[in-house]
Amino acid sequence: MHVFYSEERRGNLLILREGEVKHFRVRRIEKDEEFGVIHEGKIYVCKVRREDKREISCEIVEELETKLPPKDITLYQSVTVDLKTMDTIVRQATELGVLTFVPIISERSFQKEEAILKKTEKWKRIVIEAMKQSRRPIPMEIKKPVRLSDLIPESEENIILDNFYEGVKPKDVNLEAKTYSVVVGPEGGFSKRESQILREKGFKSVLLEPYTLRTETAVVSIVSILMNF
C-alpha cells in the first residue's frame, strides 16, 4: 500500500498538497484504490474524494494500529565532512525509530554552522520520505547543531561510540533502559581528547567489533541493538 503525508485535516478528509500531490500522481493511484496517509502521529487508510491541480482530498476509511519506538533514542551525530552522508544517516535514523537528531560540531567534523542550518530543511523533507517508506507515524525531531563540548548526559544510558580507544561491548550497556543518548563521530572518529572529555562527563564508551565501521554503518548497528534487545 502506498503511503502519503498530510498536515491538514477537514472533518473526515485528509488533504494532500504540493509535493505530496506530485508523488500521488506519479504513483498512478486508481479510482477506489486504498492508500495510507500519515497525519499527526496516526496512519489512516483512505480513498480519493476530490482531486484538482493543487490538492487532493482523501476520505478516511479506517485508522490503522501504529507502533511507537520501544526506546527513546537521541542521536548526537557529528556532521560528516561529506554532507551527503548526513542525508543517508538522517534517513536511516528515521527508519530505525530515533526520536531526536542533534547535529554536533567536533574537531574532525564539518565546521560551518550556517551551512548545517541550511541543510536542516532538506533533512526534514528526508524525514517525511523515510516516514512514508517505513510507515512511521511520528517524525524524528531535528534540532539545531551544538558543539561537542556542550553535550550533557541527560538519558538513563549515555553512550559514545569509540572504536579507537577503550570501550565496553554493547552487551555491557544497560539494554533495559528506556532513554538513550548516543554520540557518533564523523569520518575518522573523535580525537582522544574529545573522547576523554565525554567520558569525564559521564558518557560510556562503547566499542563495536571486530572492525572499524563507517559512521553511517555505526549508527545503524548501535540503534538496531538498542531497539531490539
Swiss-Prot record:
* Top-level division of the source organism's lineage: Bacteria
MF GO annotations = rRNA (uridine-N3-)-methyltransferase activity
CC annotations in GO: cytoplasm
The protein's Enzyme Commission number: 2.1.1.193
What subcellular compartments does it reside in? Cytoplasm
Which keywords annotate this record? Cytoplasm, Methyltransferase, rRNA processing, S-adenosyl-L-methionine, Transferase
- The answer to keyword DNA-binding applying to this record is no
What is catalysed by this protein? uridine(1498) in 16S rRNA + S-adenosyl-L-methionine = N(3)-methyluridine(1498) in 16S rRNA + S-adenosyl-L-homocysteine + H(+)
From its record, what is one biological process in GO terms? rRNA base methylation
Major localisation:
cytoplasm
- SUPFAM superfamilies annotated for this entry? alpha/beta knot
The UniProt similarity line reads: Belongs to the RNA methyltransferase RsmE family.
Question: What is the stated purpose of this protein?
Answer: Specifically methylates the N3 position of the uracil ring of uridine 1498 (m3U1498) in 16S rRNA. Acts on the fully assembled 30S ribosomal subunit.
Task: Enumerate the PANTHER family for this protein.
Answer: 16S RRNA (URACIL(1498)-N(3))-METHYLTRANSFERASE, RIBOSOMAL RNA SMALL SUBUNIT METHYLTRANSFERASE E
NCBIfam families registered for this protein in UniProt: RsmE family RNA methyltransferase (TIGR00046)
Question: Protein name, please?
Answer: Ribosomal RNA small subunit methyltransferase E
